[in-house]
Amino acid sequence: MRDKIKLVSTAGTGHYYTTDKNKRNTPHKLEFRKYDPVVRKHVLYREAKIK
């Protein structure tokens, strides 16, 4: 089953992306380097739960 997740910026800006993942195939937490428009740089984004 694909669950919705939130990718939160580690720059502390509060910016996030939403996506989904298959927990059976990827049980670990996702980490991506993506663009943060608040600081105008690519920073590390980590997986968090959507509340």
Swiss-Prot record:
InterPro entries: Ribosomal_bL33, Ribosomal_bL33_CS, Ribosomal_bL33_sf, Ribosomal_zn-bd. It comes from Alkalilimnicola ehrlichii (strain ATCC BAA-1101 / DSM 17681 / MLHE-1). Belongs to the bacterial ribosomal protein bL33 family. Keywords: Ribonucleoprotein, Ribosomal protein. HAMAP family: Ribosomal_bL33. GO terms for cellular component: cytosolic large ribosomal subunit. The keyword Plastid does not apply. Disulfide bonds: none annotated. GO terms for biological process: translation. GO terms for molecular function: structural constituent of ribosome. This is Large ribosomal subunit protein bL33. Pfam families: Ribosomal_L33.
